[in-house]
Swiss-Prot record:
One GO term describing the cellular component: ribonucleoprotein complex
Domain of life where this protein originates: Bacteria
PANTHER family assigned: 60S RIBOSOMAL PROTEIN L11-RELATED
UniProt keyword annotations, A-Z: Ribonucleoprotein, Ribosomal protein, RNA-binding, rRNA-binding, tRNA-binding
Name of this protein: Large ribosomal subunit protein uL5
Subunit structure, as described in the record: Part of the 50S ribosomal subunit; part of the 5S rRNA/L5/L18/L25 subcomplex. Contacts the 5S rRNA and the P site tRNA. Forms a bridge to the 30S subunit in the 70S ribosome.
Organism field: Rhodopseudomonas palustris (strain BisB5)
GO molecular function list: rRNA binding; structural constituent of ribosome; tRNA binding
Record-linked Pfam families: Ribosomal_L5, Ribosomal_L5_C
GO biological process, any: translation
Cited InterPro entries: Ribosomal_uL5 (IPR002132), Ribosomal_uL5_bac-type (IPR020930), Ribosomal_uL5_C (IPR031309), Ribosomal_uL5_CS (IPR020929), Ribosomal_uL5_dom_sf (IPR022803), Ribosomal_uL5_N (IPR031310)
Protein family membership: Belongs to the universal ribosomal protein uL5 family.
Protein role: This is one of the proteins that bind and probably mediate the attachment of the 5S RNA into the large ribosomal subunit, where it forms part of the central protuberance. In the 70S ribosome it contacts protein S13 of the 30S subunit (bridge B1b), connecting the 2 subunits; this bridge is implicated in subunit movement. Contacts the P site tRNA; the 5S rRNA and some of its associated proteins might help stabilize positioning of ribosome-bound tRNAs.
Amino acid sequence: MAETAYVPRLRTEYDKSIRTQLTEKFGYGNVMQVPRLDKVVLNMGIGEAVNDRKKAEQAAADMALIAGQKPIITYSRVAISTFKLRENQPIGCKVTLRKAKMYEFIDRLITVALPRVRDFRGLNPKSFDGRGNYSLGIKEHIIFPEIDFDKSGESWGMDITVCTTARSDDEARALLTAFNFPFRQ
């Protein structure tokens, strides 16, 4: 008896409807030309980690809960005396999500986390980089339901970059709109 592998909801939606919508809209001749999600990069810069190493470890633990994958702690490359920063001090953490974990994270981001942001009016439609990638910033990482603020005790910002295989911003915007990203009008 063969068991079927788990496929995330957004991946199924992409395969069934989004791919055909984009093919009709942009007139692709080949299925491989249709833009798709490539990866999602989460980054947390922790300024307080310069004075207290435990802050970077706590941020990494919180990011592991959010992403479902262990992040790496990033270290400074150069010394900056005005920030009291020495070389090789922990300054944040990052994680790259691909395949099923990427689709699960985007699903949670769109359906659960972004609606919990105070005074949320939609994502900025101008945050594309010109090559089909989209970046957004979150002021508080506690909007994710996996984080218990009482245990975490701190609230940090987070950068989220959604990398796609789209060649232009218009193609990427159409792809992310099809995934129900709430862009401002």
